[in-house]
C-alpha cells in the first residue's frame, strides 16, 4: 500500500480552508457576523455561535448535522500555549425519534454539549505536561493569525 500523497501546496490550501471562519471566506453572505459568527461551524469549543474566538486558537474541522445527529471532527491548535489535540464527537438529539421532521434538539442539547466537551478537553490539554513541544508553524497563516 502507498501512503496518501498530497503535495505540500495542496495540503497547505486544505489546512487554510478547513480552519477558515465564515467572514474569512470572501463570500459576501458570510460577512454578516451576526448571522454567521466566527464559531458558526466550530461546534467543539464554541457550540456553533461564538461571537469571538481568540486569535491564537485555530480549529481545523468538518461538521455535520442530519436527522438529529450533530458531528464535529476537529484538530484544535492553540499557538499561544503551544498545544494541539484532535477531538471528534457525534451526539444524537432526536427526542421524538421521528426522522426528517426538522424537529431536533440541536440548540438545546447538541451544541451546548459539543461546546462543553471541547472546552473540557481544552482545559485538560492546557494542564497536561508534554515531553515535546509541537511544531505548529505549518498551521499559521500570516494573513489572519496572531
Could you say what each language-model-derived stretch is?
Residues 1-146:
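Structured C-terminal helix/loop/strand segments within mature extracytoplasmic catalytic/sensor domains
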Amino acid at each position: 500500500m502507498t501512503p496518501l500523497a498530497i503535495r505540500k501546496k495542496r495540503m497547505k490550501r486544505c489546512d487554510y480552508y478547513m480552519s477558515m471562519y465564515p467572514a474569512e471566506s470572501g463570500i459576501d453572505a458570510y460577512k454578516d457576523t451576526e448571522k454567521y459568527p466566527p464559531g458558526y461551524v466550530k461546534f467543539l469549543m464554541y457550540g456553533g455561535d461564538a461571537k469571538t474566538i481568540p486569535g491564537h486558537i485555530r480549529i481545523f474541522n468538518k461538521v455535520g448535522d442530519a436527522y438529529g445527529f450533530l458531528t464535529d471532527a476537529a484538530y484544535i491548535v492553540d499557538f499561544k500555549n503551544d498545544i494541539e489535540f484532535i477531538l471528534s464527537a457525534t451526539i444524537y438529539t432526536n427526542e421524538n425519534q421521528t426522522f426528517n421532521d426538522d424537529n431536533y434538539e440541536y440548540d438545546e442539547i447538541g451544541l451546548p454539549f459539543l461546546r462543553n466537551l471541547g472546552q473540557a478537553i481544552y482545559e485538560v490539554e492546557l494542564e497536561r505536561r508534554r515531553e515535546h513541544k509541537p511544531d505548529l508553524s505549518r498551521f499559521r497563516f500570516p494573513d489572519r493569525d496572531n
